[in-house]
């Protein structure tokens, strides 16, 4: 977004929330989203152990490393929770304080019961036996704008 607003780039690849934020902050040159490259979330829920019978109810009372507050990945995660009757503010603890690029390392280091990861981090956690993909947010959310 910064490169587009500063004139360093003509087109940017980002989630729709970026243009919403800049609009709400009163940007003089409003960014317009004009194309959609994906229709589903591309991230995964990773657990500490294999869970072949995973249910979203398994997250109740657990700690999860989530995404940036207000970011599309976090919004999709919370949408799935609500769709499954889980209150994101009351039924579990979502840690949004860890930088996006550091959540897999934090999880490997013992933080939280679950983490939300994109590839290649989800597969890397499985390869090092630090975590197991138990759900696809893209499958469970359905299509997202």
Region annotations inferred by a language model:
Residues 3, 8, 17-21, 58, ...:
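Extracytoplasmic/secreted proteins, especially bacterial periplasmic and envelope-associated proteins
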Residues 35, 62-72, 84, 89-100, ...:
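Short beta-strand->loop
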Residues 5-17, 26-31, 62-64, 108-117, ...:
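Alpha-to-beta junction loops
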């Amino acid at each position: 977004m910064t490169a587009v607003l500063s004139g360093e780039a003509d087109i940017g690849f980002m989630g729709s929330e970026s243009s919403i934020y800049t609009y709400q902050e009163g940007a003089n040159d409003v960014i317009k989203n004009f194309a959609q490259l994906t229709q589903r979330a591309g991230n995964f829920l990773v657990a500490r152990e294999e869970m072949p019978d995973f249910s979203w109810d398994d997250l109740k009372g657990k700690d999860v490393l989530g995404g940036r507050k207000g970011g599309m990945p976090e919004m999709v995660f919370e949408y799935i929770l609500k769709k499954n009757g889980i209150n994101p503010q009351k039924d579990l603890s979502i840690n949004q304080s860890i930088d996006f690029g550091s959540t897999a390392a934090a999880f490997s280091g013992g933080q939280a019961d679950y983490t939300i990861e994109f590839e290649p981090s989800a597969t890397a956690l499985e390869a090092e036996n630090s975590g197991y993909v138990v759900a696809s947010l893209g499958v469970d959310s359905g299509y997202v704008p």
